[in-house]
Regions:
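Conserved, single-site charged/polar hotspot
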Residues: 1-367
C-alpha cells in the first residue's frame, strides 16, 4: 500500500513539474470556477499535492476556501494545490476527470480542471448540443469544439488556463453529461481539427442563425475568410429560430445604464440582415449603441440575436427576432438538419467554414 501511495504521489508530482512535451500538449486547462469563496470536494483516494512536492491525503469529503490571500484546507494555508483522486472528483454538484488545481485569485478561488483534451471534449458535447442528434452532427460538434480548444490553447499559452467552462468559451459540464454517443463522436474524429493555411481556425459557432450566418467582421471587426456568412435554410427547423420578448423600459434603463428611456428605434442593418445599431431615445437626447453591445447589456439569453424588430407601447418594449447567438461560424441546429438530410460531418464543416481543411493533430505540429 505504501509503495502504491508513493507511486501515485510521484506521478502527480510529475504532472506539477514536468517540462512541456507532446503529452502535455494533449492536456487542456479549463477554469471551472473563478468567483467562489469556497468549494466542496468529494472523491475516493483524494491527494493534494503542494508546490514543494509534498502530498496531503484528503478525506472523502473536504472543503477548500479562501483566506488571507491563500487557499485554506483544514486550517492550513497554501498558495496552490493540485488534487487528484482514484476517479472523478465532485466539485460542489459537478464531477470532473483529471486533476484539479486550486489557487487564490483576487480574493476568490480559481479552480482549474486539467485533463486530456479528448476527455474534455466528451464533456462538452451534451453541454453544447444533444448526443441524441444524428451522429454526423455530433462529430461536427466534436471537431469544432476540439479546434476551438486547440486555438485557445495557442492564444492563451502561458496563461493560468486555456478556456472557461461557460459560454464565454464553450460550455463544459465535466463528466456528468458523458455518454456513449458523445464518446463515439469524439473517438471517431480523434485528433481532427479544422485548419486554414495549416493552422487551427477560430472555430466560432452558435445555436441557430435564423437563416443566414454572420460575417466575423460584423461582430468583432476581424474579417476572416473562413468566417464569411453563408445562407442556412436548414435552421428554420431549429428550436430557437424565432423568439419574442417583452421588457419594461425601466428594466432596460437599468441594463443599459440610461435614464428617461422613452423609445427604441432600429438603426441600419448589415448585408446579413442583422442590426448594426440601436437608437435609444431618452429625456436627455438620443443614444446610438452598437447592436451587439445592446444585446450583451440586456442579456444574450434575453435578446437572443441582433436580428430583431421592436415596438414600444405603454412603458414596455416588445421584441421579435430570429436566431440565437452571434451567428458566426457553424449553426448547430442547421448542422443537425443537414445531418438528417444525409450530409457527412466533413461536408457540414466545409459548408460553414469555407476554404478550411481537416487535419490530424500531430505530436510535432506545435499546437
Amino acid at each position: 500500500m505504501n509503495k502504491l501511495l508513493f507511486l501515485i504521489i510521484a506521478i502527480v508530482a510529475l504532472g506539477w513539474s514536468a517540462p512541456v512535451s507532446a503529452v502535455e500538449r494533449d492536456l487542456i486547462r479549463v477554469a471551472i470556477s473563478r468567483a467562489a469563496d469556497s468549494v466542496n470536494l468529494q472523491g475516493d483516494g483524494m491527494l493534494a499535492l503542494r508546490e514543494t512536492g509534498m502530498a496531503v491525503v484528503l478525506p472523502p469529503a473536504a472543503t477548500v476556501s479562501v483566506g488571507h490571500g491563500q487557499i485554506m484546507l483544514d486550517g492550513t494555508g497554501y498558495r496552490r494545490l493540485r488534487i487528484t483522486a482514484a476517479g472523478p472528483i465532485k466539485v460542489n454538484t459537478k464531477s470532473y476527470r483529471g486533476v484539479l488545481e486550486l489557487s487564490a485569485s483576487n480574493g476568490v478561488l480559481l479552480v482549474i480542471n486539467e485533463l486530456p483534451l479528448e476527455d474534455y471534449l466528451v464533456g462538452v458535447i451534451n453541454s453544447e448540443i444533444s448526443s441524441t442528434w444524428p451522429m454526423e452532427s455530433v462529430k461536427a460538434q466534436a471537431v469544432i469544439a476540439r479546434t476551438y480548444a486547440v486555438a485557445k490553447r495557442i492564444e492563451r499559452h502561458g496563461s493560468p488556463y486555456h478556456l472557461e467552462a461557460t459560454v464565454m468559451d464553450q460550455v463544459y459540464s465535466g463528466s456528468d453529461l458523458e455518454d456513449s454517443r458523445a464518446a463515439r463522436g469524439v473517438h471517431e474524429t480523434a485528433g481532427q481539427v479544422l485548419t486554414y493555411h495549416g493552422k487551427p481556425i477560430q472555430a466560432f459557432y452558435h445555436a441557430t442563425c435564423g437563416g443566414k450566418t454572420e460575417d466575423s467582421s460584423h461582430v468583432w471587426g476581424a474579417a476572416l475568410p473562413y468566417l464569411k456568412g453563408v445562407d442556412c435554410q436548414y435552421c428554420a427547423l431549429g428550436n430557437s429560430n424565432t423568439w419574442e420578448q417583452a421588457l419594461s423600459l425601466s428594466r432596460l434603463e437599468t441594463a443599459l445604464k440610461v435614464a428617461g428611456l422613452t423609445d427604441i428605434r432600429l438603426g441600419p442593418r448589415n448585408s446579413r440582415g442583422r442590426l448594426k445599431t440601436v437608437l435609444l431615445s431618452t429625456s436627455h437626447g438620443t443614444v446610438t449603441m452598437p447592436a451587439t453591445k445592446f444585446r450583451m447589456a440586456v442579456g444574450s439569453t434575453v435578446i437572443k440575436s441582433t436580428n430583431f424588430t421592436v415596438r414600444v407601447d405603454d412603458g414596455s418594449a416588445y421584441f421579435s427576432g430570429s436566431g440565437y447567438g452571434h451567428g458566426v461560424g457553424l449553426c448547430q441546429w442547421g448542422a443537425k438538419q443537414r445531418a438528417l438530410d444525409g450530409f457527412s460531418y466533413s461536408e457540414i464543416l466545409s459548408y460553414y467554414y469555407p476554404g478550411t481543411e481537416l487535419r490530424i493533430l500531430a505530436p510535432d505540429a506545435g499546437f
